């Protein structure tokens, strides 16, 4: 069973990496103003060394009662996927997740939902979280019109509800 879970994780990791054009690690903040765009990444500090929360982020985390690291004694992996387009891998990934009883979270954009309603239904039916990744995948900090900003969330939620018949889970992964 352990080897199977490792296989699922490695398969997902390989598929995720193969679909990325660049991978960046680090954290940056341009300024402390309210309209600054924050970039949030992982900084690898070496083997057996926990990542450190960037000093610039500690106030933000405290303000929203959020955390950077969970219980480090607990061995938990959160498996997440960004679904912006479909290359035929998702049904295969869902098969493995189902067979191994591994839950995952899929962050989807509106066009993905519209183009793949059966896959979306299957994700939800099999107990996975299907979460919001925006309508058009913009840099959210660049949207100055409040209605356009709101629509990036609500347009996705509405089409999800039409297809699945229930509200979309309230998790959002901002596009970078």
PLM regions with names:
Residues 20-33:
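Sec-dependent signal peptide cleavage junction
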Residues 15-19:
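Hydrophobic core
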